[in-house]
């Protein structure tokens, strides 16, 4: 049997989509997923029989068979939850691997953990790559922004694979480049996510100002965001904000009006803020975005506290044009903030 170019472990939606993307680009892929009775059963078989049917992807239910199915040097992409799960999987994998083999961690791992893993594998003659992947489920399937870093020796081997599945810039350049040694790839992804935290909080506050200060309707706000997306604020987040504002449910009401105002988070924004404190670097916009998420998650407390304050719907008179222009300028703060000189 023809051996695979790359193995992928972890068949969540991101893992499945990356496997399909790799296969579509002509790479031979083998996949494996753990079995957890009652939670994760027959994951590989179901993937091969359904989404991967006819794609030439090899499914393996045994880790030893998975490793044996790979050509040398073996390249294995880990798409598992960040944290102890990565180390536990490495403990199972390393005895099965040889010198020169490559592990790529495609999750949102903490960059200091990646630094440790790079050194651990390097001492064994193997190569570890911490790889930030941005773009979500759609990006994984159709083209993501990919930020690899770690053992430089791995780059010539994995570069063709990663660049083939990356998104393409307007000039056709793949959105994938070697970032640097150690945990550099995951560090850049951490900062990227921190900027996104700031962006999303600014968008949320802009929505609040439009709704409660300018008393605009959803369609009016959608029009403004759509116009902004044609200019300097052109971005995925601004584009989908306009689309979300317009989206109606089957009953005719707006979807946004029925969404619980409690934001979740996975930790990368918090890591960015902690690192900024360690470096004595101001990062107040992103820090406040993290605090805002913490506060929003306390829904019951906010409801309780609101009962102690009188809410008065009294809209001051604002100049519409000046206010909208000011809000547009505010939305660039996350990027401007990171270009300020530091000591």
What is the role of each PLM region?
Residues 52-113, 122, 140-150:
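Rossmann-like NAD(P)-binding element
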Residues 1-61, 65-68, 100, 137-140:
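NAD(P)+-binding Rossmann beta1-loop-alpha1 motif at the extreme N-terminus of oxidoreductases
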Residues 336-342:
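Conserved small/polar residues in nucleotide/adenosyl-binding loops
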Residues 261, 265-316, 320, 324-327:
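A conserved active-site cap/scaffold subdomain adjacent to cofactor or substrate pockets
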Residues 28, 127, 282:
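Residue-level detector of anion-binding/catalytic polar loops
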Residues 6, 86-90, 110-223, 230-258, ...:
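Rossmann-fold dinucleotide-binding core
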């Amino acid at each position: 049997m023809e051996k695979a170019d790359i193995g992928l472990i972890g068949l969540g939606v991101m893992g499945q989509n990356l496997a399909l993307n790799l296969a579509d680009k002509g790479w031979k892929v083998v996949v494996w997923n753990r079995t957890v009775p009652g939670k994760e059963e027959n994951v590989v078989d179901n993937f091969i029989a359904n989404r991967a049917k006819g794609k030439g992807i090899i499914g393996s239910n045994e880790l030893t068979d998975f490793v044996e199915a790979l050509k040398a040097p073996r390249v294995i992409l880990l798409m598992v939850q960040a944290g102890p799960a990565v180390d536990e999987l490495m403990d199972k994998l390393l005895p099965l691997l040889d010198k020169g083999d490559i592990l790529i961690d495609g999750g949102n791992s903490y960059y200091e953990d990646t630094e440790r893993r790079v050194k651990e594998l390097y001492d064994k003659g193997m190569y570890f790559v911490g790889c930030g992947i941005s773009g979500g489920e759609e990006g994984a399937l159709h083209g993501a922004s990919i930020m690899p870093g770690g053992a430089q020796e791995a780059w010539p081997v994995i570069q063709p694979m990663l660049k083939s599945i990356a998104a393409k810039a307007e000039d056709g350049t793949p959105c994938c480049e070697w970032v640097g040694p150690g945990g550099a790839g995951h560090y850049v992804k951490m900062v990227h996510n921190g900027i996104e935290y700031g962006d999303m909080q600014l968008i949320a506050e802009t929505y609040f100002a439009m709704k409660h200060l300018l008393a605009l309707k959803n369609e009016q706000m959608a029009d403004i965001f759509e116009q902004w997306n044609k200019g300097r604020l052109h971005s995925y987040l601004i584009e989908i904000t306009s689309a979300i504002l317009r989206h109606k449910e089957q009953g005719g009401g707006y979807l946004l009006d029925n969404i619980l105002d409690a934001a979740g988070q996975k930790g990368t924004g918090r890591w960015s803020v902690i690192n900024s404190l360690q470096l004595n670097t101001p990062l107040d916009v992103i820090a406040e975005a993290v605090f805002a998420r913490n506060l929003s998650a306390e829904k019951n407390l906010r409801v309780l506290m609101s009962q102690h304050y009188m809410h008065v719907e009294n809209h001051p008179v604002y100049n519409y044009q000046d206010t909208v222009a000011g809000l547009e300028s505010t939305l660039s703060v996350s990027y401007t903030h990171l270009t300020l000189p530091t000591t």
